[in-house]
């Protein structure tokens, strides 16, 4: 594609693409298509409506909404005015919304529905910059405008002329967005990303993979997150139709929309993997036997790089049916936001769905590296994309430099200076290794490294990942910083634990009683012991506690991209953790 200069150029290419693409509202069983000319008309009409309210170059407009066509309509309307948008996760609490609106100085706020509107109205009094509140769905109370009423009626020709007139007024170095990091630690900071940040990263990432053109992609990761945001701009640049649904509706939408491409976090692939193996575990013996053999052949094909007659046979019997569950038309998919377990990547690759793992951060727009379609190396996050530099610091931290690196943190010059040096090198906070042929492997977060009382450094993420490979484990978090030994909180996967227990005649109605059952305790001890066998003595888990309540975004233990907020978990379960250092090695559940 001809390299665009700004995101307005990206949208211009999409709205004039042939054959004409569309936006698809695939939420809650819908399949409502908005052709590109109609989408452009709505963008122009909304931009004119916002301009009439005084929104202009340099202003900020907040969006608090789930994934839907209106998200991008608001996004592109704001960008055409030379303003920047401020995405807000719909899962945030009112105090968190207040902090973002106040810090960003947003002049207008777009709220998806009455629930999100209630948060905005609750905090509006302490956000003096907010002049206008706009509601997408529902009846607007006094003092609130609806998106439909604000969007001016314009013809297709007038819309095209208006959008074209906007393009020269927006420059590549203009601010495009303030994205507040969800943060597994510390206070969220507003990351300043320009049009050039996004355009460079989109063009560079698109250049190294065979992106399908004029086909359909599905967005279900939050568009408030930089990964789905950046990938969506690649979809627009490639002239794709873009469907939207909520993350809890993904299974249904995949079957209905049958996308050629989507992006997900590793937990999505892990859940699909776990569900497949759980369903097969209860299947008739013959079916289980066929599946086990099919998995063996699939994994062998990954290691050998060849697909012979056996693979083709099992493709008919097994693999094609699994692919059908995700639409049946995927050529590849993308994983980012956290490490993808190698065994999960190998399984999907083996059955014909190549999951390409990449790496980046909000501060890097986000893509730094990605595995290539023709030379993936599972267990790594791939090679740098063109124009991006990476090096490893003396302490193992990954540093990067290039046009993908943010302008800085909004109103936080010292925080910016702490991570971005005078030569343009950005300190990612991740510990990694770079192979001789340029493949990057991330081993842990620098801030997550546990230093025991004996001075030994323990990288917890790899150990936690090994614990999560058990179908009985939903999640696991290690602790032990400045302590004599390592301990773990293990979240039981009740979906798989209950059938496991019933098969052994154990009562399952009471969760606490189930987790305290000696047979259950022994099963989890076996999982921990098995992981410990491959660890150095100082890394081994000496004690653990079982938790019966899964971590969630709503309760604050997970970020919107399902990463564990280690400090939140530590604070919430501080008494449980303390007990593992003050008692003899005994077991206790925390259901």
Predicted segment positions?
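Structural core segment of the AMP-binding/adenylate-forming
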Residues: 53, 80-153, 523, 529
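Conserved AMP-binding/adenylation subdomain of ANL enzymes
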Residues: 199-216, 223-319, 329, 354
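Conserved pre-ATP/AMP-binding loop-to-beta segment of ANL
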Residues: 19-21, 135, 156-180, 187, ...
């Amino acid at each position: 594609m001809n390299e665009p200069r700004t995101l307005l150029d990206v949208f211009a290419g999409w709205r004039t693409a042939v054959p004409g693409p569309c936006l698809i509202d695939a939420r809650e069983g819908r399949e409502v298509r908005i052709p590109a000319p109609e989408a452009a008309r709505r963008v122009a009409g909304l931009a004119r409506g916002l301009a009439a309210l005084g929104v202009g170059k340099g202003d900020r407009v907040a969006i608090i909404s789930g994934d839907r066509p209106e998200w991008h309509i608001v996004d592109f309307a704001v960008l055409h005015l030379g303003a920047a948008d401020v995405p807000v996760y719909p899962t945030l609490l009112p105090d968190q919304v207040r902090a973002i609106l106040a810090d960003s100085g947003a002049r207008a706020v777009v709220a998806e529905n009455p629930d999100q509107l209630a948060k905005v109205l609750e905090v509006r009094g302490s956000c003096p910059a907010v002049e206008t509140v706009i509601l997408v769905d529902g009846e607007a109370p006094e003092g609130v405008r609806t998106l439909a009423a604000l969007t001016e009626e314009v013809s297709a020709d007038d819309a095209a002329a208006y959008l074209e007139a906007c393009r020269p007024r927006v420059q590549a170095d203009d601010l495009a967005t303030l994205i507040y990091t969800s943060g597994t630690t510390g206070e969220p900071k507003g990351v300043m990303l320009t049009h050039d940040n996004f355009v460079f990263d989109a063009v560079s990432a698109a250049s190294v993979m065979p992106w399908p053109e004029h086909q359909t992609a599905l967005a279900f990761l939050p568009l408030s997150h930089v990964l789905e945001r950046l990938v969506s701009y690649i979809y627009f640049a490639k002239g794709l139709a873009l469907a939207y649904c909520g993350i809890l509706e993904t299974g249904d939408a995949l079957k209905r929309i049958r996308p050629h491409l989507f992006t997900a976090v590793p937990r999505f692939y892990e859940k699909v993997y776990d569900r497949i193996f759980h369903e097969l575990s209860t299947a008739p013996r013959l079916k289980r036997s066929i599946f086990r053999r099919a998995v063996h052949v699939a994994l062998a094909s990954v290691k050998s790089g060849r697909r012979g007659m056996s693979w083709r046979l099992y493709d008919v019997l097994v693999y094609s049916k699994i692919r059908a569950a995700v639409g049946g038309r995927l050529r590849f998919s993308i994983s980012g936001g956290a490490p993808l377990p190698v065994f999960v990547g190998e399984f999907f690759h083996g059955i014909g769905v190549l999951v390409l793992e990449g790496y980046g951060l909000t501060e890097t727009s986000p893509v730094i590296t990605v595995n290539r379609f023709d030379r993936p190396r599972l267990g790594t996050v791939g090679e740098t994309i063109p124009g991006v530099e990476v090096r490893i610091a003396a302490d193992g931290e990954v540093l990067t430099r290039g046009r993908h690196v943010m302008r800085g943190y909004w109103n936080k010059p010292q925080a910016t200076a702490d991570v971005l040096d005078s030569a343009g090198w950005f300190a990612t906070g991740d510990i990694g290794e770079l192979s001789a042929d340029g493949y990057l492997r991330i081993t842990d977060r620098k801030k997550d490294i546990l230093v025991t009382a004996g001075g030994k450094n323990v990288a917890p993420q790899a150990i936690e990942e090994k614990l999560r490979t058990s179908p009985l484990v939903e999640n696991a978090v290690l602790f032990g910083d400045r302590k004599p030994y390592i301990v773990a909180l293990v979240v039981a996967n009740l979906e798989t634990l209950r059938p496991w227990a019933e098969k052994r005649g154990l009562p399952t109605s009471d969760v606490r009683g189930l987790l305290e059952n000696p047979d259950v305790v022994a099963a989890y001890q076996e999982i921990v012991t098995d992981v410990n066998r491959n660890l150095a003595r100082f890394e081994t888990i000496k004690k653990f506690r079982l938790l019966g309540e899964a971590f969630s975004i709503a309760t604050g233990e997970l970020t919107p991209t399902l990463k564990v907020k280690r400090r939140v978990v530590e604070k919430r379960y501080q008494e449980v953790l303390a007990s593992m250092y003050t008692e003899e090695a005994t077991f206790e559940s925390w259901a």
